[in-house]
UniProtKB/Swiss-Prot annotation:
It is an enzyme of class 2 (transferase). One of its GO terms (biological process) is regulation of cell shape. The active site is at 363 (proton acceptor). The keyword Isomerase does not apply. This is Bifunctional protein GlmU. GO terms for cellular component: cytoplasm; membrane. Catalyzes the last two sequential reactions in the de novo biosynthetic pathway for UDP-N-acetylglucosamine (UDP-GlcNAc). The C-terminal domain catalyzes the transfer of acetyl group from acetyl coenzyme A to glucosamine-1-phosphate (GlcN-1-P) to produce N-acetylglucosamine-1-phosphate (GlcNAc-1-P), which is converted into UDP-GlcNAc by the transfer of uridine 5-monophosphate (from uridine 5-triphosphate), a reaction catalyzed by the N-terminal domain. It holds the Pfam family Hexapep. SUPFAM superfamilies: Nucleotide-diphospho-sugar transferases, Trimeric LpxA-like enzymes.
Amino acid sequence: MANRFAVILAAGQGTRMKSKLHKMLHPVAGRPMVQHVVDQLQQVNLNKIVTIVGFGAEKVKAQLGSSSEFAFQKEQLGTGHAVLQAEDLLKDEKGVTVVACGDTPLIRAETFEELIQYHKKTGAKASILTTKVENPTGYGRVVRNDQDEVERIVEHKDANEGERLIQEINTGTYCFDNQALFAALKEVSNDNAQGEYYLPDVIKILRHQGDTVSAFMTPDFDETIGINDRIALAEAEKIMKKRINEQHMRNGVSIIDPEQTYIEPDVQIESDVILHPGTVLKGETIIRTGAEIGPHSELKDCEVGEDTVIRHSVATSSKVGNRVNIGPYAHIRPESRVGNDTKVGNFVEIKKTNLGDHSKVSHLSYIGDADVGERVNVGCGTITVNYDGTNKYLTTIEDDAFIGCNSNLIAPVTVGKGSYVAAGSTITKNVPENALSIARARQTNKEEYASKFKK
């Protein structure tokens, strides 16, 4: 197989985004758009990827890391000039080079592969990825001759009235013979309305030399859209969301309302999971079979076990076991482990806590920096007081303990196995196994005293 290379154009300023964040780093489905392009290209067995950077170069390089080499475009003088910056890294290589834009995150690896194969099949020096659109305003037009061969690409601003009627457009993605590409780039001029060096002019140069130029048309216009402003960003987000959701549904996941369900690309969901409207699944979340998520729940970097139900709740960087019932309005904060057959009820916050199997924290409690054993019942209003203003401390509640309502456990403290904490207690010392601990003032009743306040 011939050597394969890629050049990704990511040097532009992206002023229409009106953002402090570099355009290429704006996320689509939770992942920077340029990262999507790199990820898809990596699937077509490339020998090298070169990303052209300019504005925000260091941030783009930090995002892509070792997945790409980089060339710097000091002045933004057009797409042809941008590709030319990769000359030192690629000029001596033999093979094919894919040129793609960093703001086209929806192009699939399969389409890149089809373009390369079509390029090889036609024996072309250059192949263009094209598509048809009803309103081609703003796009470069693909001009063909009477034999239906590609003659040139003309940018919208440079197109005459007849050329502007053409509906076949240049998507900005190409496949070139590598050495032919860099030879032709040196002949490109900036004699055009923008005063820039256009990459599409390479097509005209190669045709004048008698070289074959082919065009591979994708029927999916949505796949080719470039993102230049927030409107296009939202459209790309919508398309990517639909693509991801439909793939999960084909794999046996029930999504009640796909338009109201957001799933990022790295999320794994097993079959027979039900996702209700308002579900947001981010990062490397894993949902096991039979689980039911939502409505209105957000999980990030979590693992959720089989047959677990989570409603109206938020969980981050935590592991939830099998047959767990969470919510409504629970918050599972990072580094928590919720065991099997447990309950985390309404208005409960758990942080950096291990909650053992068959234990319950049913309502209105904060359990932070705690190790809770099995079969523990934590009553309503229980607080683990874990912070003294400087340091965090551990609360340990051993197996089969019972914590009464409205109790404060002042860490560091241990509640022993099988022990009881009476409702309303503030516990400052360890509670022995099987003991009853009461730490509250004795009740005093003053007869008829209330009548004094009514006078």
